[in-house]
Amino acid sequence: MNWEVVIGLEIHTQLSTKSKLFSGAAVGFGAEPNTQTTLVDLGMPGALPVFNKEALRMAVMFGHAINAEIGMTSVFARKNYFYPDLPKGYQTSQMDHPIVGKGYLDVMLDDGTTSRVGITRAHLEEDAGKSLHEDFQGMTGIDLNRSSTPLLEIVSEPDIRSAKEAVAYVKMIHSIVTYLGICDGNMAEGSMRCDINLSLRPKGQKEYGTRTEIKNVNSFRFIEKAIYTEIERQADILEDGGRIIQETRLYDPEKNETRSMRSKEDANDYRYFPCPDLLPVVLTQEYVDNIKATLPELPSQKAARFQSEHALSEYDANVLSSSRAMADFFEKANNVVKDPKLTANWVMGELSKLLNQEQLDIENSPVNAQAFGELLVRIKDNTINGKTAKDVFQAMWDGEGSADAIIEAKGLKQVTDTGAIEAMIQTILDANAAQVEQYRAADEDKQKKMIGFFVGQVMKASQGKANPGLVNPILAKMLKG
């Protein structure tokens, strides 16, 4: 059977506010359990919530960034369910009247095509606490530090048709929220988590199949692997004549499998109703317009500028603008060397290679943008060639000093004196007279192949320091005799 995968994603982004959504408690990762709570977070009777206006501003910013309708009147609702880390017995969320309505994103895929993913809504809600199962014998600890932390839940339409497309969409959301400064995007710390709703249907069928939901996947790689794993599981069941059970599942990265957690609830099971402790949030057009006017440059806008200002390819511009930190690094380095293509090649090449090897973010690069740009200047002005520059960059990475200091200490400057290069070439031609005669007797096509031997001899004699841009034309001229 030829199956079509149907995917919708719910992305939970933790907003970078200083305090919680409905209390004055601080928001922070890694504090001692239950040290960042108030009576509101603990669900104590009579403790009333106070809405965080900064979270509202951030939600409206995001709405503008995804071309969405802004809910001029939004309502908080109680989502009722029981769980040990939810002391109130309900989660304050939004249902019928979210702060952000329908929007969309045009997602660039690896093959250069664009896919439009509709966004159903983005609503504000409070996070729950956290159950701690380690270090407790036969018991579960409850940490309510996370309780009432502001979340913006971004719900897509079921428009996604592959794991690659899903990851590209999540990366784009990640890029937008970090550019806006409304979320730090740290998936390892839970600042951004993804729920995957997935079903299969025969190719050409309009009706959706029965979906499962994979909860709280917290890395791009795991999102892709979880989708592939669940597609395979569902396809095996359907092809054996079985049926898919609507349920919530968990992805286990160590075993690379999804496993059942509980039956999947519908909205009716949560008995949503308007929260009596919070008034409807009513916005003015002036408020909405003022926020739109203060939006920073977004990833798609930055990519377009990189193409127009720096004549970069669409691919290079999209890669460099995919993260705000990488875009900033590129621009700072390019301000030093003033050669966008050279800077782009080195940021996406050597810098990215070492960052990946060391599993570092670009913000934690041992070589900052200024120093990186200074290295590129030495390539541009022919002080060193590209091959030597890689060795210098590695030395800079290892903390041996600046580019200039390393070049000087190791005697790596290129030979750019044409007289010295001519003398070096003459010595090599004298020592290889037979090869010179063969070269001069050969036709043009064969000469192009043979000249590499002489270039290699020059580079060997100069210990790689001869400037190739000077060697090649001088050598060609002297070989003619």
From Swiss-Prot:
Question: Which reactions fall under this protein's catalytic activity?
Answer: L-glutamyl-tRNA(Gln) + L-glutamine + ATP + H2O = L-glutaminyl-tRNA(Gln) + L-glutamate + ADP + phosphate + H(+); L-aspartyl-tRNA(Asn) + L-glutamine + ATP + H2O = L-asparaginyl-tRNA(Asn) + L-glutamate + ADP + phosphate + 2 H(+)
Q: What is its EC number?
A: 6.3.5.-
GO aspect biological process, one term:
translation
What superkingdom heads the lineage? Bacteria
Family annotation (InterPro entries): Asn/Gln-tRNA_amidoTrfase_suB/E, Asn/Gln-tRNA_Trfase_suB/E_cat, Asn/Gln_amidotransferase, Asn/Gln_tRNA_amidoTrase-B-like, GatB, GatB_C_1, GatB_Yqey_C_2, Gln-tRNA_amidoTrfase_suB_CS
Q: What keywords does the record list, in alphabetical order?
A: ATP-binding, Ligase, Nucleotide-binding, Protein biosynthesis
Q: Kindly report, in one word, the top-level EC class recorded for this enzyme.
A: ligase
UniProt keyword annotation of Ligase present: yes
Q: Extract the GO molecular function terms from the UniProt entry.
A: asparaginyl-tRNA synthase (glutamine-hydrolyzing) activity; ATP binding; glutaminyl-tRNA synthase (glutamine-hydrolyzing) activity
User: Which family does the record assign?
Assistant: Belongs to the GatB/GatE family. GatB subfamily.
The record describes its quaternary structure and partners as: Heterotrimer of A, B and C subunits.
HAMAP family per record: GatB
What's its job? Answer: Allows the formation of correctly charged Asn-tRNA(Asn) or Gln-tRNA(Gln) through the transamidation of misacylated Asp-tRNA(Asn) or Glu-tRNA(Gln) in organisms which lack either or both of asparaginyl-tRNA or glutaminyl-tRNA synthetases. The reaction takes place in the presence of glutamine and ATP through an activated phospho-Asp-tRNA(Asn) or phospho-Glu-tRNA(Gln).
Question: Which PANTHER family does this entry report, sorted A to Z?
Answer: GLUTAMYL-TRNA GLN AMIDOTRANSFERASE SUBUNIT B MITOCHONDRIAL AND PROKARYOTIC PET112-RELATED, GLUTAMYL-TRNA(GLN) AMIDOTRANSFERASE SUBUNIT B, MITOCHONDRIAL
Q: What is this protein called?
A: Aspartyl/glutamyl-tRNA(Asn/Gln) amidotransferase subunit B
